[in-house]
């Protein structure tokens, strides 16, 4: 009986030791997992800046090639998608700083991308239209933008995946 009790105690002792070891492993695993989650979370959040940098570099490339600001590009894209509209309506789609507003639209007029129209019944309203004579230039600009995006697609997708994983 003594031997059986010793054996039982040995088994119980091993079980207790196993539980202690298991608890130690679980605690360390949780700390490791927490650290990994925190590192992955931090990495994912930092990818916001990386993605923003890629987007900014696309607009910089367009600006360099076409001598148009980000706002001017967005105005054109909005006109192509939505059609002609008043300046006030465009303000809902593209944010242009008040001190840059006149210069922004006048630059697009000077470059002949758009033209302005004032209705006879309301001289205060200005409607902007895309200049359909620049249809070929529109296609070229869209191709340029598409190529700029495609050249960064993998990097931007990786950043986006890391962000979404947060």
Swiss-Prot record:
Keyword Transferase: no
SMART domains: HTH_MARR
Up-regulation conditions: Up-regulated during anaerobic growth.
Protein's organism: Staphylococcus aureus (strain COL)
Taxonomic superkingdom: Bacteria
Keywords: Activator, DNA-binding, Repressor, Transcription, Transcription regulation, Virulence
DNA-binding region, residues: 87-110
General function of this protein: Global regulator with both positive and negative effects that mediates modulation of several genes involved in virulence. Also, modulates the expression of genes not previously implicated in pathogenesis.
Similarity annotation: Belongs to the rot family.
Molecular function GO labels: DNA binding; DNA-binding transcription factor activity
GO biological process: one example: response to stress
UniProt-recorded name of the protein: HTH-type transcriptional regulator rot
């Amino acid at each position: 009986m003594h031997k059986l009790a010793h054996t039982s105690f040995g088994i119980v002792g091993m079980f207790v030791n196993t539980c202690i070891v298991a608890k130690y492993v679980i605690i360390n695993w949780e700390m490791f997992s927490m650290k990994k989650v925190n590192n992955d979370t931090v990495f994912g959040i930092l990818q916001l800046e990386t993605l923003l940098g890629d987007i900014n570099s696309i607009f910089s490339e367009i600006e360099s090639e076409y001598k148009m600001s980000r706002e001017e590009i967005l105005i054109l894209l909005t006109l192509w998608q939505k059609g002609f509209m008043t300046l006030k309506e465009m303000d809902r789609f593209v944010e242009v700083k008040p001190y840059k507003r006149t210069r922004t639209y006048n630059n697009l007029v000077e470059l002949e991308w758009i033209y302005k129209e004032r209705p006879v019944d309301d001289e205060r309203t200005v409607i902007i239209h895309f200049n359909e004579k620049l249809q070929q230039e529109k296609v070229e600009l869209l191709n340029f933008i598409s190529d700029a995006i495609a050249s960064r697609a993998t990097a931007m997708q990786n950043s986006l995946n890391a962000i979404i994983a947060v």
